[in-house]
A protein has these predicted regions:
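Membrane-interface helix-capping segments at transmembrane helix termini in multi-pass transporters
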Residues: 2, 37-48, 60-88, 136-145, ...
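Alpha-helical transmembrane segments of multi-pass membrane transport and lipid-handling proteins
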Residues: 48-75, 273-324, 356-357
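Membrane-interface helix-loop junctions in multi-pass transport and translocation proteins
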Residues: 109-113, 123-159, 342, 351-384, ...
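Interhelical loop/hinge segments that connect adjacent transmembrane helices in multipass membrane
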Residues: 143-147, 162-194, 261-270, 392-408, ...
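Helix-loop junctions and terminal segments of transmembrane helices
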Residues: 21-36, 236-267, 273-280
Length: 468
């Protein structure tokens, strides 16, 4: 049953990506730009257009599923997964409404409201799940109850966001002014995010098969793949959460200066450049913060969390991905914020091709580590191409390359200290991790402050003032 749930949720995730992943990003960007000009008519037109576009896509997707149920039978081997998709259709429809209005609120910098609504949605899911699992008159399977709780939570959350949107002076107006532009600008972003889901599926197929070709058994190949993707990579993604939060708060202020840099929509280039450089330096800080800790303590950390030391070995090697991954993430967001989504799509396609080629050819020489090398090359190539796009438009100060070099040296020094402390200690695993992390992470932060990598006070206390 759990397998059926995972399969159904994977397909639902792809559907959600296809329906509404690009619209909220472009909508928030343009709402931010028009808000700075106090152009309420264009904002209303954008929101109306977003609701119509996502609504039409939802109708088409839902119609295909309802009119051609045999399509799901081809995709799924279990009827349980098919039933879940039917139950999740209301979640698809109401989530699309939620995402559009959330994008509009994001563009208007209503960050606290967005956080509250997302928190409410999660609380609703827990409460509804508890009620459904303790209700006897609803005679459906546990997985279907889980799907139903998600659908109900999405419906209620959408209603709450609708009320909040109009109570905060949100408006709707004739969509004809922005419909075509919104559809055109959001398509590349939707393509990137849908392709990302597809690429993940391709990787899940290619890596085990290639490992089997070079001596692994089927079980060994799947096990190694599961260790890297299920244990190692989630820890590598910790800085990505911080960078995503940075993007949420700073991207609207970037879009205020220009929602399409190549068309000449630009208020103040010096301010725009300042914000872009701040974003990049902050992402470097977040990305490099845990590298030395993961290099020195990957094995004990993963042994404690997962009971698997091998995932920790992978983590130590894979930590080199974190800086190019963070750069790729923030620069992609910046390109989308200033109307260069087609450039971002092109860069993504090229970097994804590098990843797929790497995991196809490199397992012969590096085994499972080919996946780590592939993601490193993908992130590095994406970051270089994105930075090149910004550099050509004179929107970036390449002095951050010096910052990267200093951060690498700092992490080497901190990791060396961490390894020394870890080898010196002969104590309980948890205490070992705590003490070694204090020395490793502490020395990392101390060296960053000594080399003036980041002014912590400015980042924490003055960010609102700097980007108001």
């Amino acid at each position: 049953m759990l397998g059926s749930y995972q399969v159904a949720m994977s397909i639902f995730g792809v559907m959600m990506t296809f329906v509404s992943s690009g619209i909220p990003v472009v909508l928030s960007r343009n709402v931010s730009y028009y808000s700075a000009k106090n152009d309420k008519k264009s904002i209303g037109s954008l929101v109306s257009s977003g609701l119509i576009i996502t609504g039409l896509i939802c109708i088409i997707v839902s119609g295909i599923i309802l009119l051609f149920p045999n399509l799901l039978s081809i995709i799924f081997t279990s009827n349980a997964s098919t039933e879940m998709i039917y139950i999740l259709l209301p979640a698809l429809i109401f989530s699309s409404i939620y995402e559009v209005l959330r994008g509009a609120l994001w563009g208007r910098k209503k960050f606290f409201i967005i956080s509250v609504t997302e928190f409410i949605e999660q609380v609703l899911r827990i409460i509804l799940l508890f009620i459904l699992f303790n209700t006897t008159f609803i005679n459906i399977s546990a997985t279907n109850k889980t799907a139903l709780s998600l659908s109900l939570a999405c419906v209620i959350s959408a209603i709450i966001v609708i009320i909040i949107y109009f109570n905060t002076k949100g408006n709707l107006s004739n969509p004809k002014y922005e419909f075509k532009n919104l559809l055109k600008e959001s398509s590349p972003i939707t393509a990137v995010r849908t392709a990302s889901s597809i690429v993940s599926s391709i990787i899940a197929i290619i890596i085990p098969l290639r490992l089997q070709t070079f001596g692994y058994t089927a079980n060994e190949a799947l096990s190694e793949f599961g260790i890297i993707m299920g244990m190692t990579f989630p820890l590598l993604m910790i800085p990505s959460t911080l960078i995503s939060s940075l993007a949420v708060t700073i991207i609207p202020s970037i879009s205020e200066q220009s929602n399409n840099i190549d068309s000449g929509n630009l208020k103040d280039k010096s301010i725009l450049k300042s914000k872009i450089n701040f974003s990049i330096k902050s992402s470097l800080l977040f990305s490099s913060l845990l590298i030395s800790t993961f290099i020195a303590l990957g094995s004990p950390i993963c042994k404690f969390i997962f009971g698997n030391e091998k995932s920790g070995i992978y983590l130590s090697y894979a930590s080199i991905i974190m800086i190019p991954l963070g750069l790729s993430q923030i620069t992609s967001s910046i390109l989308n914020a200033i109307g260069l989504e087609m450039k971002s799509l092109k860069n993504y396609i090229i970097s994804s091709a590098i990843l797929i080629l790497s995991i196809f050819f490199l397992p012969k020489y590096f085994g499972t580590y080919a996946l780590i090398i592939g993601y490193f090359l993908m992130s590095l190539s994406s970051a270089i191409m994105n930075i090149s796009m910004l550099s050509k438009r004179k929107l970036i100060n390449l002095s951050f390359m010096k910052t990267i070099l200093i951060l690498v040296l700092i992490n080497v020094a901190s990791a060396t200290l961490g390894i020394f402390i870890h080898n010196l200690l002969n104590i309980n695993l948890i205490l070992d991790i705590i003490v070694s992390t204090i020395f490793t992470l502490g020395s990392n932060i101390l060296l960053m402050l000594c080399f003036n990598i980041a002014n912590i006070k400015i980042i924490i206390f003055n960010r609102k003032k700097k980007f108001a």
